[in-house]
Every structure is written in C-alpha cells, then in structure tokens.
C-alpha cells in the first residue's frame, strides 16, 4: 500500500497492479498557484502499490542525475523543477525568494518538509557538498539543486563591476 507522488509524465514503466491517480497540486486555487510558482506542474501522478513486489520506474524529462534523500521531520529547499518524486507524506510548497527577485537572479524554491523518501533530479551531474558550521561556498543559482533549511544563503554577483557582471553572467 505504499504511495509515491511524482511529476506528471515521469513514469517510464510500472507493474500492472500499481494504481495510478492524477492529482492537482496544492490545496485549493492559491495552493495550486503557489505550486506552479515553485516549479511544480498543475497536476501530479500518485502511484500506489496494491500487490507485493510492485515497482515503478521514473525518470526526469531531460538528461541528468537523480538522487535520493531520506527526510526525517526536516525541511529542504529545492530549485524549481528539481522535484521528481516523493513519499505521499511529504509537504511541498512553492516559495519565491525576495532576495532573488531584487538581485534579478529569478530563484524560486520548493519547500519540501516532513518524513519520507524524496527523489530530486538535475540537468547534468550532481555534486553533494557538506558544509561545516560557518563554512561558506559559492554556487551559481542556476546550478544549485537543494539545501537544508539550516543553510543561510545570499545572492550576489560573482564578478565585481558592471562589465564583469555582463561578461561573466
């Protein structure tokens, strides 16, 4: 009876006894709008195992890596569009970043919280970087996939000066 939610269109194959339901994302119209702002589609798919040994194979829409996180009553923030699938018990909400809008970087995050399995995907390879308390690390906003809620982040231009900002992106 295990249930997994996935982005619509992510299913590659599944056991014939897996039950599939289409669901709208979010709670109500504002929840659906918030989910869409956070990078989720308007609909998701819910897969429920009805027999022992049921399986499902999922893949993102583009090439790249998939990685698994086991959440245990904690919260992560994921880049818009990184969510592939997760346990039904996880709560997912969209969250725009005022920091990103002011800086022009356009970072929208998905807040994923609770306990359960979570699969995220990325265009390209995934590198996991564990930070020590107080350690700083610079990541381009277009390449950041996810981070724990305990991480404090700021959005800055990597290059100094107007010409350097245009030339470096």
Locations of regions flagged by a protein language model:
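Phosphate/adenylate-binding glycine loop and adjacent helical scaffold
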Residues: 1-169
């Amino acid at each position: 009876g295990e249930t997994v939610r996935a982005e619509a269109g992510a299913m590659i194959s599944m056991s014939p006894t897996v039950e599939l339901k289409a669901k709208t994302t979010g709670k109500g119209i504002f929840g659906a709008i918030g989910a869409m702002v956070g990078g989720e589609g308007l609909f998701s798919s819910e897969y429920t195992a009805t027999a022992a040994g049921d399986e499902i194979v999922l893949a993102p829409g583009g090439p790249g890596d998939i990685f698994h996180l086991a959440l245990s009553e904690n919260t992560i923030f994921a880049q818009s569009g990184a969510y592939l699938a997760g346990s039904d018990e996880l709560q997912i909400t969209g969250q725009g970043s005022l920091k990103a809008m002011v800086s022009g970087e356009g970072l929208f995050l998905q807040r994923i919280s609770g306990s359960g399995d979570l699969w995220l995907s990325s265009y390209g390879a995934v590198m996991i970087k564990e930070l020590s308390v107080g350690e700083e690390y610079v990541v381009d906003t277009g390449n950041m996939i996810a981070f724990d809620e305990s991480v404090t982040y700021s959005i800055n231009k990597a290059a100094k000066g107007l010409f350097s900002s245009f030339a470096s992106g």
